[in-house]
Amino acid sequence: MKGNQLELPPPGNGFFLSSSGGHFSELIYIAKRFKASSNSLILTFNGSDTKVGALEFNIHYIKYVKPRKFLPLLRMMPSIHRLMKNHEFNYIASTGAAIAIIGYLLSKIKRVPFYYVEIIARQTTLSLTAKILKLLGVGKIFVQSSLLQSSHNTYLEHPFNKYRVIKSKAFHVNGARRILVAFGTIQGFNFNRGLDLAKSIMNENDSIEWQVGFMNAGNLPGIKHEQIDRTDFLEAITRADVVICHGGIGVITDCLSSGKIPLVIPRRKSFGEHVDDHQVEIVNFLSEKGLAINLEIKHDRSVINYVLTNKVIH
């Protein structure tokens, strides 16, 4: 540590753990930011959003565990420990969620440093995982919000700070559009409110592709998928004129990386759509930068004009 600040680990072999979705996409970024070697190992949940193509790290999949269900993860700890015996690691790191606690416990057993990085969606409040880790004795963590920076929380700059919006060629806003709707793969939560808000800006001539996850979405116009293979999903984003999504950091990052400004509907705890309101935090943060539009606030056809006449560069 340098003063009160937590320093990045030296380049070497890391053991990285995360759940799926945005936690996983952030984990890949963090592994690269830590300059982890190609012998490093990533452990995550088995799902369409974690089945990436060529990756410079080894990857191991475990069964999906719903948010805040710690006991199933604890039962997996012996098998994860056995997996680690086949590798040499200089440190263990995690971006959450609850699986980070398993990573911390394993770091104590293996006597190696542990690093926790709060995902960028946490802009104003620490996650339950971060709070539990601090209670367990993790003195310092990395955060990606200047609002959370303190003597115990070291700020780690995120690539979002390098994104900016520029004008693009104009489209006729009332024309038919190719629309992709992506609501993630989280299990145990419905998002009918998101379906209704998405449909509110569509017209009958639009070509629509839906990725609805595991909720009961009923009949929808266009093509409906439960999950989309990772490669196909990125191609679908590229094809689309407009992407409507929930406030998952993974899909938002994919949109911005492809130059598109997403129309976002954050999941809210009060509607039973997620465990807390971290999606609201990231959507507010990105909306202030012009990098997203919150469809809760403005949900008519005119929002399409903004995303079609502006693009993201970095």
Task: Go through the PLM ranges and name each one.
Residues 1-314:
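Nucleotide-activated sugar donor-binding and catalytic core shared by glycosyltransferases
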